[in-house]
Amino acid sequence: MVKSIDIRQLSEAISVEKDNGTKVNYFLYPEFEIHQNVLPANTIQDWHKHQAIEEIIVPTKGNVTIQVLEDNAVRTYTANCGEVLRVKQSIHRIIGDDKEETEFIVFRFVPTGNDQSDKIKNDKVDCEKLVAEILKEK
């Protein structure tokens, strides 16, 4: 078994088809969760919120429209393919395109409140020379 890479097959996902036809494949990890969504055309999710998590939504087919209740008013935002939408702890719902299904990936995590941006930006270590040395020895 490979220790450095963890590839999850679709057969390992928790797959759910909701009453409104939305298909979701959940991949749960100890520190985060990723799920793939297929939202049928003309589908509107129920209003909901999360108690502790935040979500990052990445559209992969079509546009993702989200409505958020802010200051006692409904505000509408749209993220196109290639854009990233961060949903903080808010009352929200996702609205599908009126003509075609929408696909998107959701990354869920529990924010710690700690700024990790420097660690994230500077975490990469160049290993070209190390790998060349290791492979040269064989």
Locate predicted features.
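Short glycine/proline-enriched turns and hinge-like loops at secondary-structure junctions
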Residues: 49-51, 71, 97-100
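Short acidic-glycine-tyrosine-enriched beta hairpin
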Residues: 71-89
